[in-house]
Design a protein with these regions (language model features):
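Glycine-rich adenosine-cofactor-binding loop
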Residues: 5-18
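NAD(P)-binding Rossmann-fold cofactor-contacting core
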Residues: 17, 24-44
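Short, ordered loop/turn segments at secondary-structure junctions
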Residues: 38, 92-95, 120-121
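Short loop/helix-cap segments at secondary-structure boundaries that form the rim of catalytic
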Residues: 39-45, 59, 80
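Active-site regions of enzymes building and remodeling cell-envelope glycoconjugates
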Residues: 43-54
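Rossmann-fold NAD(P) dinucleotide-binding segment
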Residues: 54-63, 71-92
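Rossmann-fold NAD(P)-binding glycine/threonine-rich loop
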Residues: 91-115
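Oxidoreductase and adenylate-handling cofactor-binding alpha/beta cores
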Residues: 124-132
Length: 132
């Protein structure tokens, strides 16, 4: 069975946490980290690329985990990434989730991909917990 090839977009606290988690999964392989910052070193030694280099990884990464902030990053990054990659984000600006969904859904459909948005604690797992 082949491993799921993962890319991480953003390398702050959430990105480093995603990196640590992916490293523990026997069925996943971390391929690349993408950042706006230059001269970053990852904890695992995985190479860091610029955001402009992301499209070079089309077909080489199965899923992008977006680790930017909801206020300014994800609202722009998720639709852009969803055009080329299956992606997951943790968008948590409650009043804008419907707008975010609409934008990301349109981009993913145009690109023939899929996107899972607002997958975090709240909204996300905490919201599901309240249903049951």
């Amino acid at each position: 069975m082949s491993k799921i090839r993962i890319g991480i977009v953003g390398y702050g606290n959430l990105g480093r946490g995603a990196e640590a988690s992916v490293q523990l999964q026997p069925d996943m392989e971390l391929v690349a980290v993408f950042s706006r910052r230059n001269d970053l070193q990852t904890v695992s030694g995985i190479p860091v690329y610029t955001m402009n280099q992301m499209k070079d990884f089309k077909g080489k990464i199965d899923v992008m985990i977006l680790c930017g902030g909801s206020a300014t990053d994800l609202i722009v990054q998720t639709p852009a990434v969803a055009r080329d990659f299956v992606c997951i984000d943790s968008f948590d600006t409650h009043p804008r989730i419907t707008e975010h969904f609409t934008t990301v859904d349109k981009a993913a459909k145009e690109g023939g991909t899929a996107a899972l948005i607002s997958c975090g604690w709240d909204p996300g797992m905490f919201s599901l917990q309240r249903v049951f």
